[in-house]
Amino acid sequence: GEDTLSLHDALPIFRYGNVVGSRGSVVPFFQKLIDQGIDALPITHEEMTRFWITLQQGVDFVLDNFGRMKGGEIFVPKLPSVRITDLASAMAPNLPHKIIGIRPGEKLHEVMCPADDSYHTFEFDDFFVIGPTINFNNRNNDFSKTAAGEKGKMVEQGFEYNSQSNPDFFSIEQLQKMNQSKVAE
């Protein structure tokens, strides 16, 4: 029927950072070690950073952008970054850190808008849109404007949105407040 997808349909992609507290997240890993009475928290690299999003923020981001999508684009939220050393200090202020080295395949910083995609990346107030690299037939391929009519601005060539150069970082104090409110739930 007409309400089914075909090979000609282009769906959007939603790209976002580490979901706080999810499986594989460092938060439950650190908490388990703290609860076991470890004498130092293992840190793979003292400069490591990550983007940070809650599960609810991730769900809201996807739902909020359904009305903006044209199809084929990648939506990327603007998120705060966290230094892994700050997170460790927030969770266990009195525990030292032990640098253990980066594991195979692990990245020092997270990249959500690569520089190679800057020629088709648009910045909006709270998010970025990376337009598709292929042209879909019979579609409005101007991704500087969302389907909802919001206008974005093309980023400068070479622009990269990564967790290291992000201007928005959580402080240790903010991380402690987040952790305390999570414990209170």
Language-model features: where?
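Single conserved hydrophobic/aromatic residue that forms the stacking wall/gate
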Residues: 1-9
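Gly-rich Lys/Arg/Thr-decorated short loops/hinges at beta-loop-alpha junctions or inter-strand turns
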Residues: 10-13, 155
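A conserved pocket-lining segment of Rossmann-fold NAD(P)-dependent short-chain dehydrogenase/reductase
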Residues: 13-18, 29-53, 57, 61-80, ...
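Mid/C-terminal beta-alpha module of Rossmann-like enzyme folds, strongest
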Residues: 65-136, 173-185
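C-terminal, low-complexity/hydrophilic appendages and adjacent surface loops
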Residues: 124-156
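Generic C-terminus detector
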Residues: 152-185
